[in-house]
Structures are given as C-alpha cells and as structure tokens.
Curated annotation (Swiss-Prot):
Name this protein carries in UniProt: Heat-inducible transcription repressor HrcA
Record GO terms (molecular function): DNA binding
Source organism superkingdom: Bacteria
Keyword terms: Repressor, Stress response, Transcription, Transcription regulation
Role of this protein: Negative regulator of class I heat shock genes (grpE-dnaK-dnaJ and groELS operons). Prevents heat-shock induction of these operons.
GO BP, sorted A to Z: negative regulation of DNA-templated transcription
InterPro entries in UniProt: GAF-like_dom_sf, HrcA, HrcA_C, WH-like_DNA-bd_sf, WH_DNA-bd_sf, WHTH_transcript_rep_HrcA_IDD
Keyword Signal included in the entry's annotation: no
Disulfide bonds: none
Entry's family note: Belongs to the HrcA family.
Organism of provenance: Clostridium perfringens (strain 13 / Type A)
Pfam families membership: HrcA (PF01628)
Length: 339
C-alpha cells in the first residue's frame, strides 16, 4: 500500500523527469515542488519508492528515474488530462477529411499524419484486414476496347481498383448488368469463401461472358489476398529520434529495425477497441521494453476496422498525448459513421 505522501513525491518525480529528461534528486523535488517536507524526508521516501519498484537508479547518476511500474501507477491513478489549445482543437476538427467523400484508408492515413504531427511521436496503423473483409460491391467500367476497370468496395470502406484485359469489352448496358450479377453473387463473401462452387455458379449466370468472370476473379484475389503484415504502416518514423533516449547508436539501430519489422510491430499493438497504454515491461517484444505504446481502435458502427497506435520512450508527456489521442479518435470515429 502506497500512502499519499509517497504518491505526491512520485508524481513530482515523474513530472520533473518527463519535463527535463534528467534523473531527479531529493533536493530538486524539495526546491521545485511545495510538498511541505524536508529534502531528507523526500530522500527517505524515494528510497522506499525504489524498494517498492516504482523508481530506478541509473548507473551514472545519484538521482532516480521512474520505472515501468512507476509510470503505470502514474497513468492509472495520478494523471490529469491536459487541456488542448484552441489551435490544436481546430486542427483536429479540420484535418480529418470528410468520410462521405473518401475511402477509409485515405481517412486513416490523414489521421495518422495528424497524430504524428500533434504528438511528435511515431504513429503506427494496423489497417483494415482487406483479405478478411466482405465484398460490398463490384463495378466494371470500360477503359478501352480490351480493358475494363474493376472497382471493388469492401464492407469496411476499402476501395481497390484493378484494370483487367479481355477479348472484347461489352457495351455499357451489358457491363452494368454483369456488374450487378457479380455483386449479387459475391456480396458478403470473403475472398476465402469464393470457392469453385461460387465460381461455377457465376459462370452459369454469366454464360457468354466467361472471359470477363475469369479475369475479374483473379484480379479480386490479388487485390484482397495480402499478407497480414502488409497492412501495417507508419507515419513520422523519425519523430522517435526527437527523444534523447535514442541518441545512443545501438538503441537507435534497435528501434529502427523494430519499426521496419511489420510482423513485430503488428504484435505490439493491442486489438482492443478501448484506449490502451502499455509501458515498458508490459510490452513483450524485447526491442520495445523501454517504450510506451498508446493504442485505440477505430470502427464503423459496431464493426471494428483496425487500430491506431503511438510509440515513444517511457518518458512521454502522458497527460498531453492521451488528451490528443482521445480527441482525435473521437473525431475519427464520428467521421467514419458516415461510411
């Protein structure tokens, strides 16, 4: 059980360390924070906090820094969300593009760029898993006498355009009819569910247009059948190097290799719809043990689409970053309601 005085001292140490990046000593806390106790008392309390696992002592310093457990207690029990400036609020409102006009992946990329800019952190997006999505509609449009533009829309708003080659492109009225039949037969199916029986039935329904069916289906497959890890992308990768924690060439190389390993990055991110904060030892990827990751899901209605996360060192301004993340995700999910 940690008493109120220890909580006050721990909060002061964490806030000071977040601000300065320098290990904190008892004299610093006594001078800068009006806690009503002496430097000697603070020193004794800091020793207790270290014994309890809330503080650590760097090898080269007499001061203390928060441990992962200390940051966890701070986030869970002591944090106060920072009020955003009117400029920041305006930027959030005006930067997320209209959900009625753009497909989901463009909206998400715009949002990730906004988060990266506002927080000065690296933003990770686990995008909609398109090969697990359902077909919503397929539209065929004439490009020239032997080329058709195949426009696929999935249930989570992802749009894929592919040009296919055929012997001869039918007239527009016929293409509309073919598009309607293909959509009716494939709607609400995933790529894995489009089996030989489905293909056979589709060929029977479109007798005489088998060359179009046989060109459309492989195009759909190639559009949707992607490696799961390819659906992770980053924004603001270099932002991680704004923090002195990564001035060390070994740590910089390690974090860069992690950020370029999409499989590991995907494993880092919680699939929870709720906002989640993972700190240090709570992260099971070894290269991220000194990081913090804040993530939240985005969705259309009741359907979860993906996750957006921010990664940085443990020493981030949690009150500011969580405020920004909360407002941005609220605005994003409101925008996606229109999809």
């Amino acid at each position: 059980m940690i008493d109120d005085r220890k909580l006050q001292i721990l909060r002061a140490i964490i806030q000071d360390y977040i601000s300065t990046g320098e290990p904190v000593g008892s004299r610093t806390i006594a001078k800068k924070y009006n806690l009503g106790v002496s430097s000697a008392t603070i020193r004794n309390e800091m020793a207790d906090l270290e014994d309890m696992g809330f503080l650590e002592q760097p090898h080269t310093s007499a001061g203390r820094i928060p441990s992962s457990r200390g940051y966890r207690l701070y986030v869970d029990r002591m944090i106060e969300f920072e009020r955003l400036s009117s400029e920041e609020e305006g930027l959030i409102r005006n930067s997320i593009i209209d959900g009625t006009l753009y497909e989901v992946d463009k909206i998400i990329k715009q949002t990730s760029a906004l988060l990266s800019e506002l927080t000065k952190m690296t933003c990770i997006v686990k995008a909609p898993s398109v090969h697990k999505s359902f077909v919503k509609s397929i539209q065929l449009l004439k490009v020239d006498d032997v080329s058709i533009l195949c426009v696929l829309v999935t249930d989570n708003g992802v749009i894929r355009n592919t040009v296919i080659k055929v012997k001869s492109v039918p007239i527009s009225e016929e293409l509309i009819k073919i598009s309607k039949i293909i959509t009716e037969r494939l709607k609400n199916l995933t790529i894995e569910q489009i089996n030989l029986e489905v293909i056979s039935n589709l060929n029977r329904a479109l007798s005489g247009y088998e060359d179009i069916v046989n060109a459309v289906l492989p195009a759909l497959y190639e559009s949707l059948k992607g490696d799961e890890t390819s659906e992770v992308f980053l924004e603001g990768t270099i932002n991680i190097f704004n923090y002195p924690e990564y001035n060390n060439i070994h740590k910089a190389k390690e974090i860069l290799e992690l950020l370029h390993d999409k499989k590991s990055i995907s494993e880092l991110i919680s699939d929870s719809d709720d906002m989640t904060v993972k700190i240090g030892d709570e992260i099971f990827v070894p290269e991220a043990k000194e990081c913090s990751i804040i993530s939240a899901g985005y969705h259309v209605g009741d359907k979860s689409l993906g996750t957006i996360a921010l990664i940085g060192p443990r020493r981030i301004n949690y009150s500011k970053v969580l405020s920004i993340m909360t407002e941005v995700m609220k605005e994003l999910n409101e925008t996606l309601k229109n999809k």
